């Protein structure tokens, strides 16, 4: 949600943002609703003052033993008028809020303008793309040859794009999680294992719900959704709270399974474990002072890069364009890892600064002194690891000529010093 004052006083900034994002949004209706809403606030405040004044008059009359019947009639009329206005005000407030919750976030000036991923900007590359002197396989063939994944039985049990991890791939998956949590613990993150379901109010605080409903699973007959990422649960964790300024930044590392419909996956992604309905993920989430959020954004990206460098996985960093980034983010970096079996870089990380957009929706504020005015803080999020995608990268990039998989050195201690699968 954007600052209503900004929408009212500088609507051209909002129009420019909508144009850059190529989003069709009825800003004029929102502005009109805001104006009507403000007029109702003035009218209801005036009537409440009038009602209070009449109540005092009645009290004075009764104290003096005088007849207050005419004033009581006046009070009744005022109360009826106020009740009617409050109903109308609630209606316009609901209309305004519903619209305001769907407007996208502002866009940072460094974000490239463009319709889609073709306008994304490559920021850097790291690592050498592996060169093989033998015919390589993709992760689907590798996992089948080594009995590491069972897709056929998973499809029988749960449907397409589910999987059974098996044998040493289970251990490698757990090694990635354990290493990732240890890695972030050393970077001043507090570890969080959130609820795997959230209610609609929490979801609407973190995302534009109508957009995200197509992605996540709804629990039938319950006000609950399976989480698509722990980001949403961590964002809502501090909803309606005032945080002490001295405690900022708050850095959380959330570990959880994630559940997504992943509609629209095509080609080879329909097979294997790269794009699936369920996966384990470690997510970074930060509550920051507004003046520090861009520094925190770069810090988060640097930490995530360091993690993949330690895994020896070649990657590139992309700055997403206005047409490719999410509506909640003001600026997003993606990290794409090299997948040797596909001869391509594929997305593994999304790292975003959401400014005060989520904090306004979730009513999360901070202050430095007890009697000081509160401010909305900034929220940031970044994937550290979605394990199935990194399992794909490791299987393809670390395959050997005798059909095995070399285990990255930093993970070997987590697998009893095992060096290959």
Give names to the regions the model predicted.
Residues 1-129, 144, 148:
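N-terminal alpha-helical targeting/anchoring segments
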Residues 125-421:
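TRNA-recognition modules of translation machinery and tRNA-sensing kinases, especially anticodon-binding
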């Amino acid at each position: 949600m954007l600052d209503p004052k900004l929408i009212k006083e500088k609507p051209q900034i909002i129009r420019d943002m909508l144009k850059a994002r190529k989003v069709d949004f009825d800003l004029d209706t929102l502005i009109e609703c805001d104006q009507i809403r403000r007029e109702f606030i003035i009218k209801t405040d005036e009537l409440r003052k009038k009602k209070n004044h009449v109540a005092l008059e009645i009290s004075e009359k009764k104290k003096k033993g005088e007849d207050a019947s005419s004033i009581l009639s006046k009070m009744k009329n005022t109360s009826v008028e106020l009740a009617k206005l409050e109903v109308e005000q609630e209606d316009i407030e609901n209309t305004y809020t519903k619209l305001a919750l769907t407007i996208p976030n502002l866009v940072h000036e460094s974000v490239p303008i463009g319709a889609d991923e073709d306008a994304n900007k490559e920021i850097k590359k790291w690592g050498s793309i592996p060169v093989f002197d033998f015919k390589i396989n993709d992760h689907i063939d590798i996992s089948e040859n080594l009995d590491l994944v069972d897709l056929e039985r998973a499809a029988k049990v749960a449907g397409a794009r589910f999987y059974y991890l098996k044998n040493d791939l289970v251990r490698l998956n757990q090694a990635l999680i354990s290493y990732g949590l240890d890695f972030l613990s050393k970077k001043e993150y507090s570890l969080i294992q959130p609820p795997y379901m959230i209610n609609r109010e929490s979801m609407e605080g973190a995302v534009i719900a109508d957009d995200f409903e197509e992605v996540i699973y709804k629990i039938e007959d319950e006000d609950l959704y399976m989480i698509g990422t722990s980001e949403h649960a961590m964002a809502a964790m501090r909803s309606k709270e005032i945080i002490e300024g001295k405690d900022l930044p708050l850095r959380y590392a959330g570990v959880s399974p994630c559940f997504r419909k992943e509609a629209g996956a095509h080609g080879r992604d329909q097979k294997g474990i790269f794009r699936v309905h369920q996966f384990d993920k470690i997510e970074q989430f930060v509550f920051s002072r507004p003046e520090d959020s861009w520094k925190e954004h770069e810090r988060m990206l640097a930490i995530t890069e360091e993690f993949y460098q330690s895994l020896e996985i070649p990657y590139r960093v992309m700055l997403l364009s206005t047409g490719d980034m999410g509506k909640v983010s003001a600026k997003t970096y993606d990290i794409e890892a090299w997948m040797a079996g596909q001869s391509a870089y594929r997305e593994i990380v999304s790292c975003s600064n959401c400014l005060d957009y989520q904090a306004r929706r979730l009513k999360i504020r901070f202050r430095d002194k007890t009697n000081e005015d509160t401010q909305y803080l900034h929220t940031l999020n970044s994937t550290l690891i979605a394990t199935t995608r990194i399992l794909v990268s490791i299987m393809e990039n670390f395959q050997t000529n005798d059909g095995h998989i070399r285990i990255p050195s930093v993970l070997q201690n987590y697998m009893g010093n095992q060096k290959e699968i």
